[in-house]
Structure formats: structure tokens, C-alpha cells
Amino acid sequence: MIINTPEEMFKLGQELSKKYKILLLLGDLWAGKTLLTKWFANGLWIDENIVQSPTYAYINSYGWKLLHVDMYRIWEENDVWEKWINDQISKHEYIAIEWPKFIDSLDISHYAKITIEKDWDSRIVEISEN
């Protein structure tokens, strides 16, 4: 699908919040992964204005409702990380993971894999389910 406006991204985030508990978000820097997560959060009755990119923090938690993870700077899998992230996942109802890696070691099932590609002023969004 092609997203041409912020309103269309808002609508997509709202729809995803009604259908999925877990989002795996792929795309280049500034593609719109965090923006989509803001609108996903809004659909969960979380104020989208408090949702920020977890790039530097690695992980942002919005109560026990939403866990927002960025794996961009996670270079290798290890037992400590795996145990810690799975512990965090088990404590949250909804999960959004940017730059997902090591998916086989995460305790997740039935997720939407969302790829966002920049195309001038629009975004090309592909959604697949697992």
C-alpha cells in the first residue's frame, strides 16, 4: 500500500492496533517506523506525544501496555540479552520492535512484519503476517 499523508499513517496505526499485538518494523532511517508506532500506541489509548524513538535507550515502556524496542545497535545475540528482552516481552500486552533481529530467540508469535520504504513524499508499506 502507498501512504501519502500523515492522516493515512494515523489510520494504518489505528487499524494495526485492533488486529495485532506485535509489530516488527523494518525500514531505513526516517522511513516512519516510530511514527507508525505512535499511531499504533494511540489506538491503544496511549498518548502518542509521549512515544519516542528507542534508538538510544534501546527500549521504551509505556506502562505495561506497550513495549517499544529498537534493535538497530544490537550487534550480537547473547543469553543475557535474550533472557532480559523475553522477560520484558512477557510483561507487556503489545510489542513494537524496530530493526528486528534474532527473531527465533524471541518469545513472540502471531506478529505483523511491516516494511516501510521511502518514496519521495510517500511511503510504500508492505505487511505480512506470521
Q: What are these model-derived regions, one by one?
A:
Residues H68-W75:
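Switch II (G3) loop of P-loop NTPases
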Residues K33:
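Conserved lysine of the Walker
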Residues L25:
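Hydrophobic anchor at the beta1->P-loop junction of P-loop NTPases
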Residues D28:
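P-loop (Walker A) phosphate-binding loop of NTP-binding proteins
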Residues M1-L16:
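N-terminal pre-Walker A segment at the start of P-loop NTPase domains
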Residues D47-Y62:
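Short beta-strand-centered segment that lines the nucleotide-binding/catalytic pocket of NTP-utilizing
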Residues N78, N86-N130:
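Short phosphate-coordinating micro-motif centered on Lys-Gly-acidic
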